[in-house]
């Protein structure tokens, strides 16, 4: 699992190197200041959900080692237990994780419920 977390962090750093637009979506401040442990955002393709979440993750007051972005449509996450991955990240000091394309993950509803029930980490 350590190798998977290291690879996910590397991919996140690559994502951070991409230029994000300065424009903020109308939900930006509401999502940024939301205190819920689990926050889901859904909508049509191409409307800016992923971009907004990356902008928010960048602005959150956590060290880079405490936050992570993953996309479940990446082959690395195909057969991975989200609960086990998030648990391992949390044990390494993770405080917040953005899980994009979560519908691509196996049993994602059950995995999110387990994260909510047992882990102390913010998931968007």
Locate each region found by the language model.
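Phosphate-binding site recognition
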Residues: 1-124
């Amino acid at each position: 699992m350590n190798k998977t977390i290291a690879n996910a962090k590397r991919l996140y750093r690559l994502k951070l190197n991409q230029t994000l637009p300065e424009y903020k979506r109308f939900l930006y401040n509401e999502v940024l200041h939301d205190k819920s442990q689990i926050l889901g955002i859904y909508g049509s393709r191409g409307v800016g959900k992923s971009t907004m979440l990356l902008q928010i993750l960048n602005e959150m007051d956590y060290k880079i080692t405490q936050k992570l972005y993953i996309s479940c449509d990446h082959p690395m996450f195909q057969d991975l237990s989200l609960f086990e991955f998030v648990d391992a990240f949390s044990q390494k000091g993770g405080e917040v994780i953005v899980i994009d394309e979560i519908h691509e993950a196996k049993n994602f509803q059950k995995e999110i419920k387990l994260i909510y029930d047992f882990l102390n980490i913010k998931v968007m």
